Design a protein with these regions (language model features):
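C-terminal segment of N-terminal export signals and the immediately downstream linker at the start
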Residues: 26-56
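Short, well-ordered beta-strand segments in beta-rich or mixed alpha/beta enzyme
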Residues: 40-49, 80, 87-112
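Short, glycine- and small/hydrophobic-rich beta-strand elements in well-ordered beta-sheets
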Residues: 28-33, 66-95, 132-138
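N-terminal secretory signal peptides and thylakoid transit peptides that target proteins
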Residues: 1-18
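Surface-exposed, polar helix/loop patches in the mature regions of secreted/periplasmic/lumenal proteins
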Residues: 100-138
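Short amphipathic alpha-helical segments
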Residues: 53-79, 115-125
């Protein structure tokens, strides 16, 4: 009987410990890990390639874009293509977008005249029909 009682107590304590660990784990996962973009300068560029079905052109653009976002003043970057979403307010006509964030306008100004940025334009401008830029700062 003593063995059964000890086993039962062990199981109950183990269950409580597991439940407590689960609660702690769940609360740790629910913390807000969102990156705060407040105060940053956001530069978002959309490109429409002349021939988006040309794989050689796409490869050339992607390689150049990956080099472009290595500029030192860029805090974070994202090179993307239209997401597979369909709503009336979404424009999916562009071929690529490049999003980059900067500490301030001065760092973005450095980017604008940086040799890697100028090389990107020189090497790829023959690939696109249209470029549209949206810059924004926090409210």
């Amino acid at each position: 009987m003593n063995k059964k009682l000890n086993r039962r107590i062990f199981i109950e304590k183990s269950a409580m410990a597991a439940a407590a660990a689960g609660i702690l784990s769940a609360s740790a996962c629910s913390t807000n890990d969102k990156k705060d973009l407040a105060g940053l300068f956001i530069h978002h560029v959309y490109f429409w390639l002349k021939d988006p079905s040309n794989q050689e052109a796409r490869t050339r653009f992607e390689k150049a874009a990956r080099e472009l976002v290595t500029i030192e003043t860029i805090i974070d970057s994202h090179i993307g293509v239209p997401a597979p979403t369909s709503r009336d307010v979404i424009d999916t006509t562009y071929t690529y977008s490049i999003l980059s964030t900067y500490k301030n306008k001065e760092d973005q100004d450095i980017y604008q005249t940086h040799p890697k940025h100028l090389k990107f334009i020189e090497d790829c401008q023959d690939l696109w029909d249209k470029v549209l830029v949206y810059d924004s700062v926090s409210i």
